[in-house]
Curated annotation (Swiss-Prot):
<keyword id="KW-0029">Amino-acid transport</keyword>
<feature type="domain" description="ABC transporter">
    <location>
        <begin position="6"/>
        <end position="247"/>
    </location>
</feature>
<keyword id="KW-0472">Membrane</keyword>
<dbReference type="GO" id="GO:0033232">
    <property type="term" value="F:ABC-type D-methionine transporter activity"/>
</dbReference>
<keyword id="KW-0067">ATP-binding</keyword>
<keyword id="KW-0997">Cell inner membrane</keyword>
<keyword id="KW-1003">Cell membrane</keyword>
<comment type="subunit">
    <text>The complex is composed of two ATP-binding proteins (MetN), two transmembrane proteins (MetI) and a solute-binding protein (MetQ).</text>
</comment>
<dbReference type="InterPro" id="IPR003439">
    <property type="entry name" value="ABC_transporter-like_ATP-bd"/>
</dbReference>
<dbReference type="InterPro" id="IPR050086">
    <property type="entry name" value="MetN_ABC_transporter-like"/>
</dbReference>
<dbReference type="Pfam" id="PF09383">
    <property type="entry name" value="NIL"/>
</dbReference>
<comment type="similarity">
    <text>Belongs to the ABC transporter superfamily. Methionine importer (TC 3.A.1.24) family.</text>
</comment>
<dbReference type="InterPro" id="IPR041701">
    <property type="entry name" value="MetN_ABC"/>
</dbReference>
<feature type="binding site">
    <location>
        <begin position="44"/>
        <end position="51"/>
    </location>
    <ligand>
        <name>ATP</name>
    </ligand>
</feature>
<dbReference type="GO" id="GO:0005524">
    <property type="term" value="F:ATP binding"/>
</dbReference>
<dbReference type="InterPro" id="IPR017871">
    <property type="entry name" value="ABC_transporter-like_CS"/>
</dbReference>
<keyword id="KW-0547">Nucleotide-binding</keyword>
Length: 341
């Protein structure tokens, strides 16, 4: 039986409009099971419900119906002591750092331990451990105004780890950072996951974040989970239109003038590759073996952690029987051949 650390069951959240009796659903019947030790991404467009879902997971927002179980125990039980014990198992990393400007780095990290009545001796020991862990040993007595964005987020991560949480909740942890700093923060999160078996949930709209470190991903659209699975499977073979749109696999990145000027007798096709397939001369093989014309409109190669993946949008024309043979050839190579128009 799989060890699920977090189980979200039929979770819904609606907000009642003050000016009327009508309500709007922010979340609708969310079902998710997140394994222990997983780096789990939740992605979606703005307004999809990501932030509301995170607020429910950390207990700041009560659902209209449904439940969230942390290690088998309900997050919404009425016993204050039991609820406090569950919430102490979670640490929170914020988009805009949320550091106290009047406190030093060490004092910011100490804050969760102070409100948890942890002894001063233990606090000092833990602060030193965490500073070493996030690579800020030399910044202990520095104030946040003297830190870079990446350093501030490292302080935020250290603070979130202060009370030895089992779960790290990250709300857009890299969206305020430049690409190089983003990679270093994601690498730190991956190292924490590997070293401590920490379960990490990342709310993000940045596909690169999910590509770089997430094991599994859920796609949220209009308050509903429309797709969920291993990152490679979801990104290479998306099933839902919302996912395809997020990943730019519906042809929306092809210049409008090319779409308007294209010959309607030609097929607009997406070719999807992974691993060694991306290294093969597929286009030249199609042209030579099947006597068809293939015109590349857009696309390129990318990486999903250590796996090469590629997507090409091409126009294909030729005799129908030759195109059918080419499609069969692509299928035999396990290359995605999806007709867009």
């Amino acid at each position: 039986m799989k060890n699920y650390l977090i189980e979200i069951k039929k979770l819904s959240k609606n907000f009642l409009h003050s000016s009327s009796q009508h309500s709007t659903y922010a979340l609708k019947d969310i079902d998710l099971a997140i394994p222990a030790g997983c780096i789990y991404g939740i992605i979606g467009m703005s307004g999809a419900g990501k932030s509301t879902l995170l607020r429910c997971i950390n207990g700041l927002e009560a659902p209209s119906k449904g439940d969230i179980l942390i290690e088998g125990k309900s997050l919404f039980q009425k016993n204050p002591a039991a609820l406090r014990a569950i919430r102490q198992k979670m640490g929170m990393v914020f988009q805009h750092f949320q550091l106290f400007s009047s406190r030093t780095v060490a004092e910011n990290i100490a804050y969760p331990m102070e409100i948890g009545f942890i002894s001063q001796v233990f606090q000092e020991e833990r602060i030193n451990q965490l500073l070493n862990l996030v690579g800020l040993e030399q910044k202990k007595e520095i104030y946040p105004t003297s830190l870079s964005g990446g350093e501030k987020q490292r302080v935020g991560i250290a603070r979130a780890l202060a009370n030895h949480p089992h779960i790290l909740l990250c709300d857009e942890p890299t969206s305020a950072l430049d690409p190089k700093t983003t990679r270093s923060i994601l690498q730190l999160l991956a190292e924490l996951n590997q070293k401590f078996g920490l379960t990490i949930i990342i709310i993000t709209h940045q596909l690169e974040t999910v590509k770089q470190i997430c094991h599994r991903v859920a796609v949220l659209s209009e308050g509903e989970i429309v797709e969920e699975g291993e990152v490679k499977q979801v990104f290479i073979r998306p099933q839902h239109q919302a996912t395809r749109h997020l990943l730019h696999l519906d042809g929306d990145q092809i210049p409008v003038d090319l779409i308007q000027q294209r010959n309607p007798d030609k097929l607009l096709v997406r070719l999807g590759f992974e691993g060694n397939q991306a290294k093969e001369p597929i286009i030249s093989q199609l042209i030579k073996q099947f006597d068809i014309e293939v015109n590349i409109l857009s696309g390129g190669l990318d990486y999903l952690q250590k796996t090469i993946v590629g997507n090409l949008f091409v126009e294909i024309s030729g005799l129908p029987q030759n195109i059918q043979k080419a499609q069969a050839f692509l299928k035999s190579k396990q290359i995605i051949c999806e007709i867009i128009l």
